[in-house]
Curated annotation (Swiss-Prot):
Protein name: Mitochondrial fission process protein 1
Mitochondrion listed as a keyword: yes
Transmembrane segments: 34-54, 78-98, 129-149
Biological source species: Mus musculus
PANTHER family: MITOCHONDRIAL FISSION PROCESS PROTEIN 1 (PTHR11001:SF2)
Lineage of origin: Eukaryota, Metazoa, Chordata, Craniata, Vertebrata
Origin: domain of life: Eukaryota
């Protein structure tokens, strides 16, 4: 097998392709909250949540494909699904969504009280700030969620069966 084929076989659809960006849909929705109907924001959460669920199921299936004694297979699959689902729910949906929501709400408030800009300019400025913040918050949130899970949920896993960090 060539190096390129081997890399292609190891490529994770949910982590190494454009599909990963579906996990950021809710952050984009939150950034645009002041400009779009609430239903659009909720739809963005639906997209992100679907991504999280699909990734968790995929990791469970992959854990089940690892050759090992059948007795540990179900446990390994369950741990992979739970770990991925919790990690992705926190790192891709809940924490970034809350962060962008609060950043945009605060910036809209500050712009409203400290400037005389028209509402449309304030809203677009807020949206721009929210969008620009997304790449800045991703890695600190990911590392924080790693630390949180390593310090809590992952301590409950059997030592041999710890899933790899998403």
């Amino acid at each position: 097998m060539s190096e390129q084929q081997r890399q292609g076989a190891e490529r994770d659809l949910y982590r190494d392709t454009w599909v990963r960006y579906l996990g950021y849909a809710n952050e984009v929705g939150e950034a645009f909250r002041s400009l779009v109907p609430a239903a659009v924001v909720w739809l963005s959460y639906g997209v992100s949540s679907s991504y999280v669920l699909a990734d968790a199921i995929d990791k469970g299936k992959k854990a089940g494909e690892v050759p090992s004694p059948e007795a540990g297979r179900n446990t390994r699959m369950a741990l992979a699904v739970v770990d991925t689902f919790v990690w992705q729910s926190l790192a891709s949906v809940a924490i970034p969504g809350f962060t962008i929501n609060r950043l945009c709400a605060a910036s809209l408030y500050v712009l409203g009280t400290m400037t005389h800009w028209p509402p449309t300019v304030r809203k677009w400025t807020t949206t721009t700030l929210g969008l620009l913040a997304i790449p800045v918050i991703i890695h600190p949130i990911d590392r924080s969620v790693d630390f949180l899970l390593d310090s809590s949920l992952r301590k409950l896993y059997p030592s041999v069966e710890k899933p790899s960090t998403p």
